[in-house]
A protein has these predicted regions:
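A short, charged helix-loop
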Residues: 215-242
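A short, Trp-centered hydrophobic/proline-enriched beta-strand micro-motif
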Residues: 119-128
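Short glycine/proline-enriched turns and hinge-like loops at secondary-structure junctions
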Residues: 67, 135-138, 163-168, 182-185, ...
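Flexible, small-/acidic-enriched active-site or ligand-binding loops
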Residues: 138-140, 144, 196-225
């Protein structure tokens, strides 16, 4: 365990088992309802609160357990064994949901809002993608400084944004300096969703990930105080890319959890399926397939652990972003 953690090794191991039992038990049963409604029931959010899903990854000063990144991802591997839409929500909750504000928020905003993540008093979404501008320096949403009001005025649209049905704030990346080149054009903001001019726009259903709240967003003259800027002016792409680097490893770990469960199911099926008088697990061709599956799963787990070793030493280390990308690509 991380020496700064507030729980013991035994408590952590018990928590891993608790999470696995939770996602393979009631969460899998609830998914039948979610497949029809495309909405998470309130009992899902309450269960996450009761089982510390919104708390466990937070820094100690904000109600968390002080876990290392390796330990955080061990928890994620367990809940990734469950339904994909729920996994997506819990993956985001344990990473981008709070990490962007923690890493780049202004001190007074962090002090006000960071303690509210632990019990889902607040939740966020990450608004980068646009229909016509992709996810890079070619974005078209703008925030223009109004000298008279002393505020930024946000206009534009976002697309394919997750968790909009259960969040109160958006991390918005937009253009603040159109005359500059490349990434320097962009800045990031912590945007309250209850501001006048902030609109949620329905979009066609996305295949898979039922319940995870995908919509578009539209901003019409949304007024933002200067303290809502994340990082400095012109650092919008830095905010996005640094945050997404860690998120890439969470996606890789999601794939790891899914793969591990599928591997276990494959072994069980190979033992049960009998052809010509013997289980197919006795057949060499099936054993080779299973061995290759286990080899790839083990390699992915080792790749993720290697990233964690670097990240836990220095989360701004030279190879953190590179190794995060390797994890996601390999998965």
């Amino acid at each position: 365990m991380n020496p700064n953690a507030t729980i013991t090794d035994e408590q952590f191991k018990a928590y891993l088992k608790k999470v696995r039992d939770m996602v393979e038990g009631p969460y899998t049963e609830w998914q039948k309802e979610i497949e029809v409604t495309n909405t998470f029931p309130e009992k899902f959010y309450q269960s996450n609160i009761d089982n510390d899903i919104y708390r466990y990854s937070l820094p100690v000063e904000y109600g968390g357990w002080g876990l290392s990144e390796k330990e955080i991802l061990q928890v994620q591997e367990e809940f990734s064994r469950g339904p994909s839409g729920m996994r997506m929500h819990m993956h985001y909750a344990s990473d981008l949901n709070w990490r962007i504000l923690n890493d780049f928020g202004q001190p007074e905003i962090k002090e006000k809002y960071m303690p509210l993540f632990q019990d889902k008093t607040i939740f966020t979404n990450f608004a980068l993608t646009e229909k016509s501008g992709g996810t890079g320096a070619d974005l078209h949403s703008t925030a223009v400084w109004d000298e008279e009001k002393g505020k930024w005025i946000l206009n534009g649209e976002k697309w394919l944004i997750s968790h909009t049905d259960c969040s109160q704030f958006s991390y918005v990346i937009c253009v603040t300096d159109p005359d500059k080149k490349g990434d320097d054009r962009l800045s990031a903001f912590f945007v309250p969703m209850d501001r006048p001019g902030f609109e949620i726009v329905p979009m066609p259903h996305m295949m898979g990930c039922r319940g995870s709240g995908h919509t578009g967003l539209k901003f019409t003259n949304v007024e933002l105080e200067p303290e809502l800027m994340l990082g400095k002016r012109g650092e919008g792409m830095k905010v996005a890319m640094h945050s997404l680097a860690v998120s890439r490893v969470h996606i890789a770990t999601s794939n790891l959890g899914i793969s591990q469960r599928m591997f276990e199911m494959s072994i069980a099926r190979a033992r049960d399926r009998v052809t010509f008088g013997k289980p197919i697990i006795k057949r060499q061709a099936i054993r080779v397939k299973l061995a290759n599956m286990q080899m790839m799963i083990h390699a992915l787990r080792c790749t993720i652990i290697d990233f964690c070793d670097d990240f836990d030493l220095d989360n701004n280390g030279e190879y953190v972003s590179e190794k995060a990308a390797i994890c996601k690509l390999f998965s």
